[in-house]
From Swiss-Prot:
Homodimer, and heterodimer with PDK1. Interacts with the pyruvate dehydrogenase complex subunit DLAT, and is part of the multimeric pyruvate dehydrogenase complex that contains multiple copies of pyruvate dehydrogenase (E1), dihydrolipoamide acetyltransferase (DLAT, E2) and lipoamide dehydrogenase (DLD, E3). The gene is PDK2. This is [Pyruvate dehydrogenase (acetyl-transferring)] kinase isozyme 2, mitochondrial. It is found in: Mitochondrion matrix. Changing G342R: In a glioblastoma multiforme sample; somatic mutation. Its EC number is 2.7.11.2. Expressed in many tissues, with the highest level in heart and skeletal muscle, intermediate levels in brain, kidney, pancreas and liver, and low levels in placenta and lung. Kinase that plays a key role in the regulation of glucose and fatty acid metabolism and homeostasis via phosphorylation of the pyruvate dehydrogenase subunits PDHA1 and PDHA2. This inhibits pyruvate dehydrogenase activity, and thereby regulates metabolite flux through the tricarboxylic acid cycle, down-regulates aerobic respiration and inhibits the formation of acetyl-coenzyme A from pyruvate. Inhibition of pyruvate dehydrogenase decreases glucose utilization and increases fat metabolism. Mediates cellular responses to insulin. The modification Phosphotyrosine is found at Y215, Y216. Its main location: mitochondrion.
Length: 407
């Protein structure tokens, strides 16, 4: 394990390799939204949560730590990636301190909650730091199709794993820290058992509108329509994590507003952004439609790529949102949707506008964590060598067949 041995220069990290090898042999245990609710119900047991997390968190950490070692050496050698690796190793060792502790000891439970808060804070900057590592790699070595494909595959899994780990930590710390959230007293941890979808839409719109008004001195209006197939007279509610939904919607609103304002800069009236929320038997779908000029079909997948950001690289100390400069808004938003078996897709008509659709599971029993697992299938993905395509590639200058030429 190349990166682990480098970390062994620090004696305090010497136990990491054996823990990584041990826990990476187990597959993560995905939880459903209903199970999260049960963990945090009025009969929630801190000892049960402690016993589960001290086993499950190392499994999730070790699985992704094994996988990161499959990245190209050139990526692993960047200072930013090495820093992220050191955070993961330290967090794993922090949890190992509790493997043999007694769940009946209240001091142990309190110390465990404090340790989880420390781990969560340590990992606050994982996304921008890993993004910086990708930039360091690109600046030094340029673009390589095979490496790019592996990095895209890994980062989707790495960031999804991070979302899941933070979800577990947040649920435990929010429920068992001995206090209630005064702003959201009915929330169970970070989950709202009765999340009003349209209210989250409005909150995300209002924040994006503030930014749009600040930079463009104008912003499009919002039109919301709800279709509840089960009961047309009832507003649409679901069991969900409002912060996850807000993250997705805020990113989509920012993109839609910018496209709308910039494509209608000579118009006195901006076309509104239309949002439709539809609840069916299986899916809850949210469609956001703008008239911002659209995107060519060939560029759609690039919008979800970590390697093709057109945004300027963020400069330290300039303020603002760090992710804005890395162009990670859409790919991370899609991962939030996929985390509980949903999806985020874009449908664009160049010259007109774009529809963005968020698909979520309508039932809490169907909303089950989507988790990466380190196994032979994942390993083989990194060993794949890009071969020549089996479709003709059109030349940039098609052959002129209008005139007969003697060869």
């Amino acid at each position: 394990m190349r990166w682990v041995w480098a970390l062994l220069k620090n004696a305090s990290l010497a136990g990491a390799p054996k823990y990584i090898e041990h826990f990476s042999k187990f597959s993560p245990s995905p939880l459903s939204m209903k199970q999260f609710l049960d963990f945090g119900s009025s009969n929630a047991c801190e000892k049960t949560s402690f016993t589960f997390l001290r086993q499950e968190l190392p499994v999730r950490l070790a699985n992704i730590m094994k996988e990161i070692n499959l990245l190209p050496d050139r990526v692993l050698s960047t200072p930013s990636v090495q820093l992220v690796q050191s955070w993961y190793v330290q967090s794993l060792l922090d949890i190992m301190e509790f493997l043999d502790k007694d769940p009946e000891d209240h001091r142990t439970l309190s110390q465990f909650t404090d340790a989880l808060v420390t781990i969560r804070n340590r990992h606050n900057d994982v996304v921008p730091t890993m993004a910086q590592g990708v930039l360091e790699y690109k600046d030094t070595y340029g673009d390589d199709p095979v490496s790019n494909q592996n990095i895209q595959y890994f980062l989707d899994r790495f960031y999804l794993s991070r979302i899941s780990i933070r979800m577990l930590i947040n649920q435990h710390t929010l429920i068992f820290d001995g206090s209630t959230n005064p702003a959201h007293p009915k929330h169970i941890g970070s989950i709202d058992p009765n999340c009003n979808v349209s209210e989250v839409v409005k909150d995300a719109y209002d924040m994006a509108k503030l930014l749009c008004d600040k930079y463009y001195m104008a912003s499009p209006d919002l039109e919301i329509q709800e279709i509840n197939a089960a009961n047309s007279k009832q507003p649409i509610h679901m069991v969900y994590v409002p912060s996850h939904l807000y993250h997705m919607l805020f990113e989509l609103f920012k993109n839609a507003m910018r496209a709308t304002v910039e494509s209608h800069e000579s118009s006195l009236i901006l076309p509104p952004i239309k949002v439709m929320v539809a609840l069916g038997e299986e899916d809850l779908s949210i469609k956001m439609s703008d008239r911002g000029g659209g995107v060519p079909l060939r560029k759609i997948e690039r919008l979800f790529s970590y390697m093709y950001s057109t945004a300027p690289t963020p400069q330290p100390g300039t303020g603002g949102t760090p992710l804005a400069g890395f162009g990670y808004g859409l790919p991370i938003s899609r991962l939030y949707a996929k985390y509980f078996q949903g999806d985020l897709q874009l449908f664009s008509m160049e010259g007109f506008g774009t529809d963005a659709v968020i698909y979520l599971k309508a039932l809490s029993t169907d909303s089950v964590e989507r988790l990466p697992v380190y196994n032979k299938s994942a390993w083989r993905h990194y060993q794949t060598i890009q071969e020549a395509g089996d479709w003709c590639v059109p030349s940039t200058e098609p052959k002129n067949t209008s005139t007969y030429r003697v060869s």
